[in-house]
């Protein structure tokens, strides 16, 4: 307890985190892209290479997953305006939201119905390509739909994949790995929803369940993989490959905005609100957005009050050297995808200069907004996916933040607020009804 008091003396906001208060922290260390980029350790070339790799796999994906065929084997989600929800939020919170609110529906991505369809699937494909190229079975000029042949399935069946997950990452990696022919084991934390485990098992995936939280599931997955040279462990806490799979979203969004005639520049700022668990998904997406829109995009991470691992790590500068449990927080939240007690040290250090801020919200707030979105827009998400929905009113309410960045009322009036909906498209009907019943 004495250590917590010392921490609070240096970092006063920790007191609010410990008290489980909804907290907003605007990052005083936020810099320009030019200043912040070198610290990421990855470049635009790396993201372009990821983009190209996904293009090589497009013919394969189009055949393996017919739901991607219309998009030519591209796994991408819609961006939709949510004007009725914007009005509802203004009414509920008594706060005008300047500009226009949009929803990025990663909740409805093909294959696994969450943002993890970006990073998880990309890393599995990257590993499969590497093995096939090294074995001389494939060249990068080939039509990758040959990977669907029995010979390739046979080849990949010698190899296995392991991952630790609270649910959605396991879903994307499990489904993709099983499709390619890998043996796959998903180490699931106590937070993982039963339907996600059942879905994985229906794809022939081995699911190992733990009574502990996410950190333990990842650690056990890592250990299990170490003993088997043919087993590849996908490391959600440190993976650069996952990060790049998410980062591709930046250029894709830029293209979607161009199609819609939506301008993002100094006079028309873009604010993006990303739910954050361990940090790989939001970190990678934010990195891609920064490369695509430069200093005209402002990224915020959103976390449950019971799992504020990234806010705690970045705010104190301790990153993965501190967990929410260290300050007496239980890491128990209805936002199962965000139930992470210790943030990725890689993501925190890579992105701490490129984030405008982080905030927390209560589980009940997520349930309330889940209900409002279903009522107003007919869009149903899982609780985690609503974390970003609390962002616009926090930004619009903070005169200090607006002044620090020199935003005029005109600029704010021209702003786009993009809420990144991270999951929920595959939630079973009865489960969704339970979520809806919890909203006020």
Swiss-Prot record:
Report a single Gene Ontology molecular function: D-serine ammonia-lyase activity
Reaction(s) the record says it catalyses: D-serine = pyruvate + NH4(+)
Q: Which InterPro entries match?
A: D_Ser_am_lyase, Ser/Thr_Dehydratase, Ser/Thr_deHydtase_PyrdxlP-BS, TrpB-like_PALP, TrpB-like_PALP_sf
- The name of this protein is D-serine dehydratase
Catalytic class of the enzyme: lyase
Instruction: Give the record's keywords alphabetically.
Output: Lyase, Pyridoxal phosphate
Q: What is its EC number?
A: 4.3.1.18
**Database matches in NCBIfam families:** D_Ser_am_lyase, PRK02991.1
> Per its UniProt entry, which superkingdom is the organism in?
Bacteria
Q: Name one GO biological process term.
A: D-serine catabolic process
Give the originating organism.
Salmonella typhimurium (strain LT2 / SGSC1412 / ATCC 700720)
Q: Which family does it belong to?
A: Belongs to the serine/threonine dehydratase family. DsdA subfamily.
Alphabetical list of CDD domains matching this protein: D-Ser-dehyd
Q: Which cofactor does it need?
A: pyridoxal 5'-phosphate
Question: Where are residues bearing N6-(pyridoxal phosphate)lysine located in the sequence?
Answer: 116
Gene that produces this protein: dsdA
Summarize the subunit comment.
Monomer.
| Cross-referenced Pfam families | PALP
